[in-house]
């Protein structure tokens, strides 16, 4: 069995390209750790950059991208199950598993072996919370996490009212229905963190946002709405899907959308780094690199 390699980093750090070039070199396959790239036809807004999976004339196999329909709400429990199916398959075929992404909760869940069980919806709780603001819900969630000592659901993944309500629902369920530890074992992994200078990251985020808008991100969202997906379901996915949906539906002007979305992505990248630093405090050893050459110096 091969020791997994994990490549993590904030948005616009270049982690996917580093991971795919590594995969081409060591006969690896990528398991995505991105909470939004699981959705089909949500390509531009999630930054799938599938061209990065073609290296030196070779297609790099990838997993957990384009696996569910847009409009659904994929969750951590499903991700953990899908990850282990992909991981076991890659190991069985003697290939090198490479976990790559920026969703810290997903990465930590599979590395640490979070003990998870499916949590049903709580209609009464949802009704009681539906009129509360995101700030109020965040405060409630913080208090629940204080009670349980939970490390799940930080601000990186709870950036809308719907997401916050679901997080509260899960934390409250775990208080009301404690379950014995069971499930996945922790996975030993060499963890590579792709570091990028803050100002360069901001520059790349701004440049990439404008490129994606030019590529037709608004048309992508119009197409999803045209399929009958309600605007609130797209807003649930946050960032590009939240703000561009508000533009397409007339809530924001184009300039307002660009300005607010750009700020939100910068804040998101900062929260991603906060999560990764938190992982280090929780005992994960992350080897930070700036480029591909640094990576190969770490490999046996």
Residue ranges of predicted features:
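Phosphate/pyrophosphate-binding catalytic cores of soluble transferases and nucleic-acid-acting enzymes
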Residues: 1-300
